[in-house]
């Protein structure tokens, strides 16, 4: 099933997201002191990423049935690159197997096909924690490593509707610290990770992601 977001997802309009009528705002998330400390790894210059203001709302609605059953839902975020900025225009929800604390994408060739046809970059992913807090589990970190090793700007959105202090977060692995930890870890399942040698945490909140009021996107629900 393909769902088109509103306003109209015409790519001719998407490419004009820098027009004067659009409103772009940095994503600000409260309660970040326990993750960001010391010198942010984003001292390394990263491209800005724009997401639609409707992305979180639309994904949360698509995940509602699973959330009510205490099952996770996941999706891939794909973007095009224009003038040094990534614009997320596509949300792909693959076939998947879920539990209350995990979500495994199936038939990922379908996801790759959509991305390749549209010449899009896999810049991140989004998933729910239906009954847990807003954080990145060890399994989430390994999943995200596979994105960030390809695209340094890759980010992970966690939607946690039952977390009263923070209903969502946008995260990335610290670089080089967190990336080195994950690169050298061969464990599977839920497990602790050592602290990076540079003194930073394994992951942190993103500061280069912005909500764009004029950015249109399409949703491919392949379930």
Curated annotation (Swiss-Prot):
Signal peptide: none
Cofactor entry: Zn(2+)
One Pfam family from the record: JAB
Gene Ontology molecular functions: K63-linked deubiquitinase activity; metal ion binding; metal-dependent deubiquitinase activity
Binding site for Zn(2+) 2: 142, 185, 191, 193
Enzyme Commission code(s) on record: 3.4.19.-
Site, as annotated: Indirect zinc-binding: 72
Residues that hold Zn(2+) 1 according to the record: 127, 129, 140
Coiled-coil region list: none
Transmembrane annotation, as ranges: none
SMART domains: JAB_MPN (SM00232)
Keyword annotations: Hydrolase, Metal-binding, Metalloprotease, Protease, Ubl conjugation pathway, Zinc
GO biological process: protein K48-linked deubiquitination; protein K63-linked deubiquitination; proteolysis
Domain comment (free text): The JAMM motif is essential for the protease activity.
Name under which the protein is recorded: AMSH-like ubiquitin thioesterase 2
Lineage: Eukaryota, Viridiplantae, Streptophyta, Embryophyta, Tracheophyta
């Amino acid at each position: 099933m393909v769902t088109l977001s509103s306003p109209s997802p015409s790519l001719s309009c998407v490419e004009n997201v820098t027009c004067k009528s659009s409103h772009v705002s940095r994503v600000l998330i409260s309660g970040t002191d326990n993750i960001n400390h010391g010198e942010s790894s984003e001292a390394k210059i990263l491209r800005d990423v724009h997401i639609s203001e409707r992305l979180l709302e639309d994904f949360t609605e698509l995940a509602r049935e699973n959330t009510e059953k205490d099952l996770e839902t996941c999706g891939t975020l794909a973007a095009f690159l224009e003038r040094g900025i990534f614009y997320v225009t596509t949300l792909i929800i693959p076939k998947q197997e879920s539990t209350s604390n995990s979500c495994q994408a199936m038939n990922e060739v379908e996801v790759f096909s959509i991305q390749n046809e549209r010449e899009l970059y896999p810049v991140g992913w989004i998933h729910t924690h239906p009954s847990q807090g807003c954080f990145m589990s060890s399994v989430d970190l390994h999943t995200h490593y596979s994105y960030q090793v390809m695209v340094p700007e890759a980010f992970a959105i966690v939607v946690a509707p039952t977390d009263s202090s923070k209903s969502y977060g946008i995260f990335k692995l610290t670089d080089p610290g967190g990336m080195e930890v994950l690169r050298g870890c061969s464990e599977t399942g839920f497990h602790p990770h050592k602290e990076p040698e540079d003194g930073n945490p394994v992951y942190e909140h993103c500061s280069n992601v912005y909500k764009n009021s004029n950015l249109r996107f399409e949703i491919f629900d392949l379930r």
